[in-house]
Amino acid sequence: MMLHAQHMPGQPGTPSLVFLHGFSGDCREWQPVGEQFHGCSRLYIDLPGHGGSAAIPVGGFADVIRLLRATLISYNILKFWLVGYSLGGRVAMMAACQGIPGLCGLVVEGGHPGLQNEQARAERRLSDGRWAERFRHEPLTEVFHDWYQQPVFASLTAQQRQALTALRSQNNGETLAAMLEATSLAAQPDLREALNALAFPFYYLCGERDSKFRALAQEVAATCHVIRNAGHNAHRENPAGVVDSLAQILRL
């Protein structure tokens, strides 16, 4: 089995760019950024529970990474960079730390490296469980209205919140809930030590108004690019700034 994806071919001999979206996004999320890199092959993946992969069930990160590897093989992608936002960034970090063949470099935007104690994991497990129940049983417009009131999204304007709520409400609440539970931050190990031992380039992107993830970026051995005029979802709020950073990282 493989994940649904959109593939845009590039010039032979260059590493592919593999983009992983955040929770409740889909393969379109990264395209305004990725399509500025025409020379590279680009693969935009729908993670399980989302978009064209909505019906694919997973029990945890191991299943997601297995599907990711199968998808890369199906497209004959042998050398690539992983570029992931939030949930996609956590999947990318997990894959990198476990060792995924062909990975040349890692770019994470606003991805959490992991909680550091059991109390924090227990609290997160309860929180994610409550959100999952809401996604299963309540209208998505109501759930996402509240979702985007969370402190991490404090930099969004009312208009941006309204637009995101309308966009994300097109998802399937049941499959979102299942993916939220399967890949909860509570189920993710603390990756700091493993990330610090990576043998390939690791870059971290965060919005200048995203104080939480700017602080987390200092806890991993990554070169950090701060994206101006942006909060947690920097590639949506300032795509040109993220394109500039990726161009520097990839030397394109």
From Swiss-Prot:
Annotated catalysed reactions: 5-enolpyruvoyl-6-hydroxy-2-succinyl-cyclohex-3-ene-1-carboxylate = (1R,6R)-6-hydroxy-2-succinyl-cyclohexa-2,4-diene-1-carboxylate + pyruvate
UniProtKB keywords: Lyase, Menaquinone biosynthesis
InterPro entries: AB_hydrolase_1, AB_hydrolase_fold, SHCHC_synthase_MenH
EC identifiers of the protein: 4.2.99.20
Role this protein plays: Catalyzes a proton abstraction reaction that results in 2,5-elimination of pyruvate from 2-succinyl-5-enolpyruvyl-6-hydroxy-3-cyclohexene-1-carboxylate (SEPHCHC) and the formation of 2-succinyl-6-hydroxy-2,4-cyclohexadiene-1-carboxylate (SHCHC).
Pfam families in UniProt: Abhydrolase_6
Gene from which this protein is expressed: menH
Source lineage: Bacteria, Pseudomonadati, Pseudomonadota, Gammaproteobacteria, Enterobacterales
Superkingdom of origin: Bacteria
Pathway the protein contributes to: Quinol/quinone metabolism; 1,4-dihydroxy-2-naphthoate biosynthesis; 1,4-dihydroxy-2-naphthoate from chorismate: step 3/7; Quinol/quinone metabolism; menaquinone biosynthesis
Protein name: 2-succinyl-6-hydroxy-2,4-cyclohexadiene-1-carboxylate synthase
Assembly: Monomer.
